[in-house]
């Protein structure tokens, strides 16, 4: 890949490294993307997944909390937190985060069903 210039370039490089199992390189690329765009949620998700694969669960939680600061209803961030807490043996916290993800998922389904119903009227 040519010298990446944009946050998206670094993000896609991170995806490539992650796919190749090069977790440290993926993390570095996601962090470069975030230096350029600290609110780049996809890069934060990638970072959380790379940390999860590396079994660095505290950093998974940290990355997911950064996502939630941008979007408190991000289902994947709540799921990432739940999985990390579970792996840390923090069952009540894992259940709480998992429940939050499920409730948000149900709300999303209801909104989608409602919008489909309105479109059929």
Question: For each of these PLM feature ranges, what is it?
Answer:
Residues 3-35:
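Alpha-helical segment of the N-proximal tetratricopeptide repeat
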Residues 20-29, 54-66, 88-100, 105:
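Structural signature of tandem alpha-helical TPR/SEL1-like repeats
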Residues 32-54:
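Short, charge-rich amphipathic alpha-helical segments embedded
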